[in-house]
Amino acid sequence: DHHNHDLPHSPRGILKRQVQRLTERGFTGMFASELEFYLFNESYEDIHEKNYRNPKTAGYYIEDYNILQTTREEPVMRAIRKHLQAIGIPVENSKGEWGPGQEEINVRYCDALTMADRHVIIKHVARKINYFYG
């Protein structure tokens, strides 16, 4: 809230209580994040104008473990990785995923609250970089 107190029913407040329960039992929760998202060859505005029908993905076939396909998205993925590293979020890897245009980024594990914060930041960075690249 505006007094810097936790809101008891917020996701952050709930997570803090769960972490405290773990600590009281002698455990430490460590978490990692694997985020998957799609890259499109159209802007958000263009996709919206088409009523979100048939957006043009950056890839055209299954990308999972296809090292040649991911070179097409590498400028965007490199920018995402570099920006995350620059703000202190350690990226372990990124790769193309199953669906056309689907990407994955994995970050190193850390404590639960830090990972929750990082997860939100990673999503924001990925959206903004993708928006910049169109």
What is each PLM-predicted segment?
Residues 1-134:
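Glycine-rich, acidic/polar active-site loops that bind/position phosphate-bearing ligands
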